[in-house]
Amino acid sequence: MAGQQPEVGAQSGVEPQAEAGPEVAAGLKAEADGLAVLGSQTGVVDELKLGGQSEVGGVAEAGGSLERQADSPPLRPADALVIAGLVPMSTVDWPGNLVATIFTQGCPWNCFYCHNHALIPTRLPGTVPWAAVRELLGRRHGLLDGVVFTGGEALRQDCLADAAREVVEAGFRVGLHSAGCYPRRLADLAASGLLSWVGLDIKALPEHYPAVVGRPNSGQKAWDSLEVLLASQGVGGPDFEVRTTVVPDDVTAADAVEVARRCRELGVGAFALQQARSQGARSGFTAVAPGWDAQCERMAAQIEALGFERFEFRPA
């Protein structure tokens, strides 16, 4: 999964959202009260808020999930997007931007530390229709900078480009959290001109990926996705940051500094080191250990010394 950090994402426990001004907060309260909302930091499910009986943009809500009335067929290609959650306003999913964050259902990888493991299954139906996103954006001009697609892994859905195009046509920029599972699809989307920014998770060195994500050949795909983004920089491709999430006593921690060093040598300008968190993860997973915080601070200092244009340490 991709939600900043992880992946419902990538890439992202409850992360406090920065307070908005009164005019923004008042305008968004109605959406937050009636919608299925998944909070995130880089892709981690922070909380689920389900309203009672309400109606959002003509879409009926019953029992806490939003469904099209009378099983009406999709009216546009983007209506096929399977959405597990929507945050009407986020300050943490795209650095320096105020965005709406869309959590897509399904991820082909199975990271053991995933904070959004409920979004890994690929056959679950969505709970938020694209019509609700469309209606939200119609009222948020001047209040939001853009929309971030996270997951799960948003690139696994064929209609992602259609949804991104609608966002751009509505006057907003598009951000993406990805674990790099689909380098060819990422290349196509980067070349389309629809993407403004990508948060790419590089979880480990290529040879150690199967131990992290539970899938063979996964490391090659993720590092190929990094090459895709680097190659796009000279031809109008999206800005991007690489994020590595670390777990105590694990290969992710052992690899982190070397991952950062290789990224810097390849020309990556923005890098983030993220501590995994126990909140929202599978039962039995723990992201704490004696001396772990101090170890992460030492890793952060080593990575910062590599000279990235922008480096951020994101503690748990």
PLM features: residue spans?
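N-terminal intrinsically disordered, low-complexity tails
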Residues: 16-21, 25-28, 35-38
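Short, flexible loop segments at the rims of nucleotide/cofactor-binding pockets, characterized by
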Residues: 123-126, 152-153, 175-176
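A secondary-structure boundary/capping signal
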Residues: 103, 150-151
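Conserved alpha-helical substructure of the radical SAM core
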Residues: 117-147
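Auxiliary Fe-S-binding modules of radical SAM enzymes
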Residues: 1-7, 13, 29, 33-35, ...
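Conserved AdoMet/S-adenosylmethionine-binding subsite of the radical SAM
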Residues: 134-146, 155-287
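Canonical Radical SAM [4Fe-4S] cluster-binding loop centered on the CxxxCxxC motif
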Residues: 75, 92-128
